[in-house]
Amino acid sequence: GGLMGFGLASHVLGRGADAFRMSLWGVLVGVPAFCAVIGAAPLASPMIFALGVWMIGLGGGLFAHGTLTATMNMAPGDQTGLALGAWGAVQATSAGVAVALGGVLRDGVAVAATPASAYSAVYSIEIVLLLVTAVVMAPLLRRRAAQPLPAGTASSA
């Protein structure tokens, strides 16, 4: 899913799509993806689980490519390397903290409940965080929608 997300984002962004909107699509794919993974356990459905995992990768690829492209587009021409490094550092730090906190929470809940319940708790928090991300991104999308498109872009033709 992740590779497909990166490939799709590359294709769409290469045609002039807005990077912030691409990031939002990643968030919007992630919400039902985590719901599918949570729902797969009580339904005992490996297919729903696999679909959810694939969608998590797809959403992650869309989001990552969108945020990287937005970061690079906002950087001054002589500071794109710095922007890339900062983006990478934020991604790595965020992923590390998320995995650590998710693991601690999963283990803590698993002591009192089933492993499926523990993962459901972690993924439910992820859903809430994705929804918060969508809300936080709204001003970026509104501000960009109000700006005129540069002449010659695919969307201005």
Predicted regions and their residues:
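Transmembrane alpha-helices of Major Facilitator/SLC transporters
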Residues: 1-14
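Cytoplasmic membrane-interface "Motif A"-like loop-to-helix N-cap segments
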Residues: 11-28
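A membrane-interface helix-boundary motif in multi-pass transporters
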Residues: 18-21, 104-128
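C-terminal ends and interior cores of transmembrane alpha-helices
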Residues: 28-44
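Multi-pass alpha-helical transporter architecture, strongest
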Residues: 40, 119-157
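Hydrophobic core of transmembrane alpha-helices in multi-pass small-molecule transporters
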Residues: 46-64
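Intracellular juxtamembrane helix-capping segments at the cytosolic ends
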Residues: 62-76
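Loop-to-transmembrane helix entry/capping segments in MFS-fold secondary transporters
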Residues: 75-90
